[in-house]
């Protein structure tokens, strides 16, 4: 039986996402011919290049095409010229030499940045963004029926997916899909329809729907009752916890012509569990627009060990809140070793927060085994994050830790239920210095506008981050704005946080609207109106503001901060973006500084 | 002007065309935001900034609000729109005069009854800044079908689309139609909120002589083209009166002065008699004459876009 794991059109691919443990066992099961295909890689290749204009013009009559092209010309939009340049840039994203200097990276991204802007200016069906991929304008992504209805459309998005799947043979008996966002859900629905049209007998299963803040787990019963998603997918695996056991069982049931239908759990498949074949085979690195294969994976299927933050919806994906056991970490390391041998150079551990003790164990074991890998992780700042621990982590190949600092206001931390006894702003600053001393990079996330937070508190946090990160290398940050999600403590008790008139959640997880109590609303309005200025101030403090004015700069900054490209840079000893306050003046239009002087300064 | 090679030029013969996503989306959204801002914060409205609308009411014919767009939209944005429209019109239609637009607002009850603008221009343009998601209905531009609506349908039951084309006022859509076509605007119904209404910028497009780009000057071109037109008029003087409307040619002239090709960019010539079949032959004759022209030698190639009007002047004296 031929089984395809299809990577869906979505965010700009710079890393490979681990499909899960099920892959390793199914891949070595002789009954199945398992393969994967990145439709996403092909989709971006279709979008960023000359096929884009063809797809846009295809449905028009020759006269309409002539008139549309005349409109581009009248608007000074050189669609074909920019497409050629952008397609070249896309290829150069895979070339290691692109990442040698600020200048070469910015030069590479400039035409890509320009073309992405053009894609969003010359058509109004969807907005394309490197973070999410295509986002259809004016579509209600919180409603599964809206998505199912739209998935029948024959617009530009549909045609671009058609163009991206032409290389996928229509011979698979089973197609497995994973989604990470509502946008992915739409492309999954559209892709599923196309697979079905090519081969009506194919079984299409949505096997995973949990990533970061997104998960269908909280609304799975509503979705089951609405019969929307299962009108397109044959099966949907309800629980992410059970995915790795359910996928092999599902394949076995399909092979035995006893395929279940609809939302399924492991217990719905009556076949007895077979022992998985011995050994396993790693998920082969999918093509990406990065020069190195990076695997986005996890150490365990455990929730964050803290699991208390009142704003956090990430816990909805998994059931078990305990920190991973010693044996689990060792098993994960065995798997990572196999994946490193299969060609992955870097590992991004996306567990919401690994405890200091888990990290300590993981790092020690890497060092003991003499494994040479580069890795990054996420953690929650604790007193146990000592200089010694940071040294050990760096020694084992860790190059970056993400910390959700959120705010330095103790009052707001208490409201967030994220207070750590004995850990104040001074301790946090000391931890940052210790990380820098150990040679570790850091990505710091903040939340502004938590209900009740004042503008002054946000400014204090931003000033603190500006001061402390300015002295560090390889430090990036995200100043997020508070969003209300249903499946969170604050979403369950909005009144206790001064929230009212909370928007009715749809059946697809997403942020909810709300109103603040009058006593809090004015300050919150002021804070929101100041946010663009505060962001600019933080960028200025840390030397990132000027880069926005350089062609390619906005995209370069974004990919450096939030994609696998950042890992490529940060894992090097000579990262040209290590600290923009210390590096040479960035090249800007009209800046007489020559490229050679910039390179020399670096 | 970057004109397409003649072999790929399609002749526009339809009575109307639509160009979706006419402006870059950000440019269109900026203009719409100016409109939204104008209507926002109603407490701060002042006579000098907000008493700007002309309620154009002609009993039985027209009921809508109109103004000059720069009273709501930042002037440089309106200028940009006009510049783009002029360039587009020159490239796509071969007509380079575009009248300054009105900005019109249709709220509930507003409409335009059927009429034509035969005395106003060659083509009308309607550029929509209406929201795609709105709480009103109606506001479509209606353009009657060509031909004899009675005789063409005597044996066939027909309704709306059988008699006219209804064009939705989609955001950032440009509609251009033959000014001689009977047209109107479907009555808008629903909310009285102006932001839910139909906003369009509209005006007329006319010919204003040849458009010349390349090595030859306008003067060099005009005198040679005139030869062909005089020759054609001499041969077809009596029959020219049987036809009405614009035809636009695009000539590609080599450095040697020879015409490399002559394409028909637009042909909206209509016979007074619906049964007349003579125009295609006359058009071929005119194309042949233009193709045979010999222009002065020049340092490079030249593209000439030449409108020719059949029939008597469409314009009122002094217009």
Predicted regions and their residues:
Chain A
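Conserved SAM/AdoMet-binding glycine-rich loop
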Residues: 3-8, 201-203, 330-442, 448-453, ...
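Acidic, low-complexity intrinsically disordered segments
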Residues: 4-24, 30, 39-333
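C-terminal accessory regions of radical SAM enzymes
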Residues: 6, 10, 14, 22, ...
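A structural motif corresponding to the C-terminal end of an alpha-helix
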Residues: 30-32, 168, 172, 232, ...
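Short acidic/polar active-site loop segments enriched in Thr and Asp
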Residues: 173, 310, 345, 399, ...
């Amino acid at each position: 039986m031929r089984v395809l794991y299809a990577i869906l059109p979505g965010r700009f691919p710079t890393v490979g996402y681990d499909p899960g443990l099920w892959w390793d066992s199914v891949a070595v099961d002789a009954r199945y011919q398992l393969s994967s295909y990145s439709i996403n890689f092909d989709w971006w290749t279709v979008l960023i290049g000359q096929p884009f204009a063809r797809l846009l013009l295809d449905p028009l009559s020759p006269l309409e095409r002539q008139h549309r092209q005349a409109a581009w010309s009248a608007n000074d939009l050189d669609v074909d010229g920019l497409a050629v340049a952008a397609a070249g840039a896309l290829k150069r994203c895979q070339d290691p030499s692109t990442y040698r200097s600020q200048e070469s990276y910015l030069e590479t991204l400039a035409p890509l940045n320009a073309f992405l802007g053009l894609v969003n200016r010359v058509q109004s069906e969807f907005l394309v963004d490197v973070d999410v991929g295509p986002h259809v304008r004016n579509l209600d992504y919180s409603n599964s029926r809206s998505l199912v209805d739209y998935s029948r459309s024959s617009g530009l998005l549909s045609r671009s997916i058609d163009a991206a799947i032409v290389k996928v043979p229509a011979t698979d008996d089973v197609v497995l899909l994973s989604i990470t966002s509502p946008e992915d859900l739409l492309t999954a629905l559209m892709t599923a329809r196309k697979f079905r049209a090519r081969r009506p007998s194919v079984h299409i299963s949505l096997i995973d729907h949990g990533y970061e803040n997104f998960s269908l787990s909280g609304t799975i019963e509503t979705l089951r009752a609405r019969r929307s998603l299962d009108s397109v997918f044959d099966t949907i695996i309800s629980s992410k916890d059970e995915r790795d056991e359910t996928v092999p069982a599902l394949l076995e049931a399909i092979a035995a012509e006893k395929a279940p239908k609809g939302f399924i759990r492991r217990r719905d498949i009556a076949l007895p569990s077979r022992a998985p074949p011995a050994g396993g085979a790693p998920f082969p690195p999918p093509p990406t627009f990065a020069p190195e294969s990076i695997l986005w994976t996890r150490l365990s299927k455990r929730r964050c060990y803290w699991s208390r933050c009142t704003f956090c919806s990430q816990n909805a994906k998994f059931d078990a809140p305990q920190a991973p056991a010693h044996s689990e970490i060792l098993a994960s390391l065995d798997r990572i070793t196999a994946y490193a041998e299969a060609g992955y150079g870097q590992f991004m551990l996306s567990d919401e927060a690994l405890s200091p003790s888990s990290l300590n164990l993981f790092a020690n074991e890497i060092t003991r085994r003499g494994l040479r890998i580069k890795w990054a992780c996420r953690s929650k700042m604790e007193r146990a994050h000592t200089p010694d621990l940071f040294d050990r982590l760096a020694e084992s190949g860790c190059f970056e830790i993400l910390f959700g600092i959120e705010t330095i206001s103790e009052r707001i931390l208490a409201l967030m239920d994220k207070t750590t006894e004995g850990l104040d702003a001074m301790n946090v600053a000391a931890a940052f210095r210790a990380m820098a001393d150990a040679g570790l990079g850091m990505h710091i996330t903040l939340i502004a506008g938590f209900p009740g937070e004042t503008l002054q508190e946000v400014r204090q946090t931003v000033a603190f981050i500006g001061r402390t990160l300015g002295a560090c290398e390889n430090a990036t940050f995200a100043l997020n704005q508070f969003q209300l999600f249903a499946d969170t403590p604050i979403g369950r008790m909005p009144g206790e946080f001064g929230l009212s008139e909370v928007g009715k959640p749809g059946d697809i997880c997403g942020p909810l609207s709300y109103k603040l109590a009058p006593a809090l609303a004015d300050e919150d309005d002021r804070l929101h109106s100041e946010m663009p200025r505060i962001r600019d101030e933080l960028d200025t403090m840390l030397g990132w503001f000027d880069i926005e004015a350089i062609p390619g700069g906005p995209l370069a900054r974004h990919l450096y901060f939030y994609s696998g490209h950042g890992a490529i840079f940060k894992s090097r000893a000579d990262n040209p973006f290590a600290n923009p306050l210390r590096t040479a003046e960035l090249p800007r239009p009209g800046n007489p500084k020559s490229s050679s002087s910039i390179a020399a300064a670096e | 002007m970057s004109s397409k090679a003649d072999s790929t030029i399609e002749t526009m013969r339809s009575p109307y065309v639509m160009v979706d996503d006419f402006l870059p989306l950000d440019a269109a959204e900026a203009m719409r935001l100016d409109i939204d801002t104008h209507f926002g914060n109603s407490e701060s409205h002042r006579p000098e900034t907000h008493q700007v609308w002309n309620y154009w009411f002609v009993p039985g014919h027209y009921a809508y609000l109109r103004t000059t767009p720069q009273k709501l939209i930042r002037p440089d944005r309106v200028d940009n729109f006009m510049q783009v429209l002029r360039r587009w019109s020159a490239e796509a239609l071969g007509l380079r005069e575009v009248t300054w637009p009105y900005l019109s607002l249709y709220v509930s009850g507003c409409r335009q009854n059927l009429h034509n603008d035969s005395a106003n221009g060659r083509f009308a343009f309607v550029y929509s800044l209406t929201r795609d998601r709105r709480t009103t209905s109606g506001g479509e531009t209606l353009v009657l079908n060509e031909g004899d609506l009675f005789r063409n349908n005597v044996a066939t039951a027909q309704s709306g689309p059988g008699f006219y084309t209804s064009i939705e006022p989609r955001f950032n859509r440009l509609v251009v139609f033959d000014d001689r076509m009977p047209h109107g605007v479907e009555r808008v119904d629903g909310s009285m909120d102006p932001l839910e209404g139909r906003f369009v910028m509209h005006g007329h497009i006319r010919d204003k002589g040849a458009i010349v780009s390349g090595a030859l000057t306008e003067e060099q071109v005009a005198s040679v083209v005139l030869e062909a037109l005089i020759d054609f008029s001499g041969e077809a003087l009596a029959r020219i009166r049987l036809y009405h409307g614009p035809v636009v040619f695009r000539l590609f002239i080599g450095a040697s002065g020879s015409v490399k090709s002559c394409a028909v960019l637009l042909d909206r010539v209509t016979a007074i008699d619906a049964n007349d079949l003579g125009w295609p032959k006359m058009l071929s004759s005119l194309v042949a004459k233009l193709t045979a022209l010999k222009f002065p030698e020049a340092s490079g190639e030249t593209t000439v876009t030449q409108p020719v009007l059949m029939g008597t002047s469409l314009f009122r004296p002094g217009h």
